[in-house]
């Protein structure tokens, strides 16, 4: 079996069940025993880890803002960056055609692999191990959401106990409206 010690060190977990890690690293292009089911579980584990940390770190934040922050932290781009930081793409098992078309660097593939490995960590080491991986690679969720103007105004008004604003379109300009 391939040596994954560098990857284990990067994610902060030494696997007892190496076959689980191998499955998490197996792209669907290789065969039936791939990482898709683990990806499903990893998505849920990731959302729980991030939600718990946001809840703990931001006691003043209301539900809508917490949801926005979670969406920002678990988006594909962020997970792909985390996967790249530990060279997860290099460890993936995939067929030659997928590799030839840039599969090891594809953000969607990296995001899926990140979630799969997270699920494998969860199954192998429990929730605490999964949480540690998330905190190590995504951060402690201390950043705040960069809300768009409308959302920021609405959140401010809600915090003040005031009614939500009413919006009226005055004009539509730009390339999308020509």
Language-model segment annotations:
Residues 1-178:
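Double-stranded RNA-binding/processing signature
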């Amino acid at each position: 079996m391939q040596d994954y010690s560098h990857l284990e060190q990067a994610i902060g977990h030494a696997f007892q069940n190496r076959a689980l890690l191998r499955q998490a690293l197996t792209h669907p292009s290789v065969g039936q025993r791939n990482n898709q089911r683990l990806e499903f579980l990893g998505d849920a584990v990731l959302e729980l880890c991030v939600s718990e940390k946001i809840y703990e770190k931001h006691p003043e934040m209301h539900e809508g803002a917490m949801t926005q922050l979670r969406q920002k932290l678990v988006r594909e781009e962020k997970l792909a960056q985390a996967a790249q930081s530990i060279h997860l793409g290099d460890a993936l098992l995939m067929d030659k055609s997928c590799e030839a078309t840039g599969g090891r660097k594809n953000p969607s593939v990296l995001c899926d692999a990140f979630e799969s490995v997270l699920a494998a960590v969860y199954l192998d080491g429990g929730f605490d191990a999964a949480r540690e991986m998330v905190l190590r690679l995504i951060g402690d969720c201390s950043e705040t959401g960069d809300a768009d103007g409308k959302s920021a105004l609405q959140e401010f008004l809600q915090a003040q106990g005031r009614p939500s604003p009413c919006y009226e379109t005055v004009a539509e300009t730009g390339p999308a409206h020509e």
